[in-house]
Amino acid sequence: MSEKKTPNDFTIEKINTDVLIIGGGTAGCYAAEFIGENSPYQVVVAEKADIKRSGCLAAGVNALNAYISGGHTPQDYVEYARKDAEGIVRDDLLLTIAEKVNVVTEDLEKKGLVILKDKDGNYVTRGWRNVKINGENIKPLLAENVYKQKNVRVINHINITDLKYEGEKVTGAYGFSVRDQKFYEINAKAVLIATGGAAGLYRPNNPGFSRHKMWYPPFNTGAGYAMGIRAGAEMTTLENRFVALRCKDTIAPTGTIAQGVGAKQLNSKGEIYETKYGITTPERIYGTVEEKRAGRGPCYLKTEGISKEAEEDLYKAYLNMAPSQTLKWIESGKGPSEENVEIEGTEPYVVGGHTAGGYWVDTERRTTLNGLYAAGDVAGGAPQKYVTGALAEGEIAAKTIIADLDKNTGSRPTGELSEDTGIRSNGDLTETENSSAGKSTESDVFFQYKKHFNETETLLSCEQAEEAMQKIMDEYAGGIATDYRYNETGLDIASTRIADLVKLSDTLKADDMYDLLKIYELKDRLTVCLALIAHMKARKETRWHIFGENADHPNQDKKYDCYVNSVYKDGEIQVIYRPLVKDTPESLKRR
């Protein structure tokens, strides 16, 4: 933790580059490597942690969940994803991903990733959509290849908070070091958002010290969504929340068991219930919730009786991804062959790699803001991306950035940006009804940073404010406490109370840079909460059980065979309904 200093002891570093990549996770690393290998453009990767162990792959994975085999085609994958999402997907985006997932898988293997093979040398698959790997080192492999690029600079431990723009073009971003008392102004001709989704909006399964034992990285706080929302970028399908079905307490993946040993979902009476409710992702969780509501819980994956060899495989598989599950089995003295594995749903997340919430982008991953691109979990419209889909989007965005810079479509050289460059700062979004803030200068962003060091002690600490936010979302916006159900009255209460917390967040006090980081993570989550609530109110149906369980409208409604999009404008989140995309229509063109 950095040494406590006075609010005036800050340095400002200004950086000029061709491409700024915000987020050094899966998509960000792959995009940086691609631009580095295939162009002369200078790239800066801004990462809040360290790219070697950051993002969703930090601890590793034991499978690549998007790999097409068994004679299936990319079109089959699109159909699978569309069916799972009840039709609310972008076919055009999904197809561009599905056409690349096998190619990027083979590229990962060339980089050194161990993909399991059978005696004939073929990949060991789980069904037709994924392959087994030894993936503990997958993120270090990606990071290593980024560092090999001579024209790529990685800045670790920097938190980006606000986009910078000139006129209608995004021209960089502002941020601060999470270790040293340093502020950053980064000027760029192109900016790629690759910050992942949003965790920590809702109260999690485990309390207290274990509250970060969750499915999605707790450090993915929705920063990429938030800075885009504040800047006026169009968002899509945020209401399509994701809830994961997980092993109880450890929050370890269940797919490894369900697909690896064919385990069925079982209630406390020994009845297999999954066929009763359906087997899409949300239906599996819906069935578990309904069985518990009916008094037939706890619920399990039926593993009792599997072979010792299969049990050993599960031990090893979880050591590659969620070692706490293996440790729990060992500590209890009973492995999965002796005892069924209890399951539960997590709190909801906003994540564009599993469901479809995120930036509204074209097929080349341009957002609606000129000069701004999106890839990975932060990009909307294309669920079921997983690791390889994020890599594919990183490459697609990288190719687009290179092509756009080659065309030099009106962008100035990075060293010639005007001094009167505008931004939207965190301070602009103080309540959902306020008037739209005007453009600000860099001093406004840095003033906001310094302001938190000058604040006196407030009623709530940052941690208490975060807990208040999670309690509000849990109880009024469809969290675990309400079995994921919500209604309009509750959403209105949530919106009002979250807006109050937004105001309070501006008064929070920081004693060091880590405190400042936590304050801005809270601010970003609050911004995402407000947008999420607006989307949930706008879809007046239950399109997806659990993911969007609207108690006022418990059935699907063909009227909502459309996308719910939004733009933050004139001080409020304005909802836009867009028709479903099958090709590349006029609705995709940038404003």
Task: Identify the function of each model-found stretch.
Residues 15-17, 180-190, 368:
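Core beta-strand elements of the Rossmann-like FAD/NAD(P) dinucleotide-binding domain
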Residues 19-45:
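N-terminal Rossmann-like FAD-binding beta1-loop-alpha1 element of flavoenzymes
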Residues 49-76, 255-257:
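Conserved N-terminal glycine-rich FAD pyrophosphate-binding loop of Rossmann-like flavoproteins
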Residues 164-184, 191:
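Conserved beta-strand-loop-beta-strand element in the redox core of flavoprotein oxidoreductases
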Residues 407-422, 426-512:
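Long, amphipathic alpha-helical stalk/connector segments used for oligomerization, subunit docking
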